Amino acid sequence: MASEGDKLMGGRFVGSTDPIMQMLSTSMSTEQRLSEVDIQASIAYAKALEKAGILTKTELEKILSGLEKISEEWSKGVFVVTQSDEDIHTANERRLKELIGDIAGKLNTGRSRNEQVVTDLKLFMKNSLSVISTHLLQLIKTLVERAAIEIDVILPGYTHLQKAQPIRWSQFLLSHAVALTRDSERLGEVKRRINVLPLGSGALAGNPLDIDREMLRSELDFASISLNSMDAISERDFVVEFLSVATLLMIHLSKMAEDLIIYSTSEFGFLTLSDAFSTGSSLMPQKKNPDSLELIRSKAGRVFGRLASILMVLKGLPSTYNKDLQEDKEAVFDVVDTLTAVLQVATGVISTLQISKENMEKALTPEMLSTDLALYLVRKGMPFRQAHTASGKAVHLAETKGITINNLTLEDLKSISPLFSSDVSQVFNFVNSVEQYTAMGGTAKSSVTTQIEHLRELMKKQKEQA
């Protein structure tokens, strides 16, 4: 139980904090991850205090020496957390006093935990988003380079989980890569909005000591300085934006995982996952389960929940700082860890899976070329709606005869439309089918190659900004 003397603001209070209240209030177990950035921010603030004449040069040197010692203790895992440490700020402040005495109390002159915590969180997120961006770009690169290698593989494309039209395997891979590039762009946008310094805002009214905030900005490598102190210490837009971007990213990863799970089933047999990303059954020896993909899919729900929870926290808050905001860090840390793990696993899955070109080609059926049959008539001058009807009649006639559409005779087809001639046989070729989609974004080889080149250039730009 914290005694009156243990309280950071003990002068105002008589008696001890209720132990249950203390347990509810403390965030120390979560905030230990902020230890290094908290010290980093304190070092910058100490230098600003010295420039403002609050600290002497000797006092600054003692404070910096103490902070460096604390940083070393955290890095070596020997920092001792006490029961009275409510959060990372009080823990570091308490330890600094133990090391250098009462001079430590000068460090927080004009500084509030309200500004400390948001500064720490922004510093942490700047670093974390750079790591996540790197992992995301590696996944995109893996998809793109695999698409380049396996560009000649053709398989069924699906809508409503029913066979629709032939596509290149590369077109499938690139569809996911393109979605992920949007996530990469959004991460960059969030990082730019995080990059605004709140330190120097005080509890809410600002800093009264003529602190040089431009110096703080430079020391902590922020791009700009917050404009309004009340907004700076309370805004968590950047948390919501990050969790929103993470939610969209997980939607895309979940979709990709679901596609690959389906394609890996024995019913499809299009691909096989590496043993490194599969598990077995505790009962059935023959099983090879796609647990890696299932976990990616399930982690999406976890991230969605974090976004929903922080939105509920923020919804009813009045202006400036409220203790409710303590919930933001757990959400951020959890999602950072989830994305970091999921992106690396997804990259591993994509880089090691083996495709079955034979099974993909076997799954191609003549009925998938019904659209091509309609387009054949369009090229002969028939309006598309009439051509669509004519092709549908051909499908029905083939079903009635118990044969595939490509086995209808020329006479059968002419009974539907006199525009059919002997060159209709060229329609029933899967390579010809995919090669007609030459418009930008299509599944023709030339178009897919253009997509690959474009994505490579885009990745270069995004890597420079990560």
From Swiss-Prot:
InterPro entries, A to Z: Arg_succ_lyase_C, Argininosuccinate_lyase, Fumarase/histidase_N, Fumarate_lyase_CS, Fumarate_lyase_fam, Fumarate_lyase_N, L-Aspartase-like
Tissue expression per record: Eye lens.
Keywords in alphabetical order: Amino-acid biosynthesis, Arginine biosynthesis, Eye lens protein, Lyase
GO biological process per UniProt: arginine biosynthetic process via ornithine; L-arginine biosynthetic process
Catalytic activity: 2-(N(omega)-L-arginino)succinate = fumarate + L-arginine
CDD domains (alphabetical): Argininosuccinate_lyase
Binding site for 2-(N(omega)-L-arginino)succinate: S27, N114, T159, N289, Y321, Q326, K329
UniProt-listed Enzyme Commission number(s): 4.3.2.1
Site-annotated residues for Increases basicity of active site His: E294
Function: Delta crystallin, the principal crystallin in embryonic lens, is found only in birds and reptiles. This protein also functions as an enzymatically active argininosuccinate lyase.
Family annotation (HAMAP family): Arg_succ_lyase
Oligomeric and partner information: Homotetramer.
Similarity field: Belongs to the lyase 1 family. Argininosuccinate lyase subfamily.
Protein's UniProt name: Argininosuccinate lyase
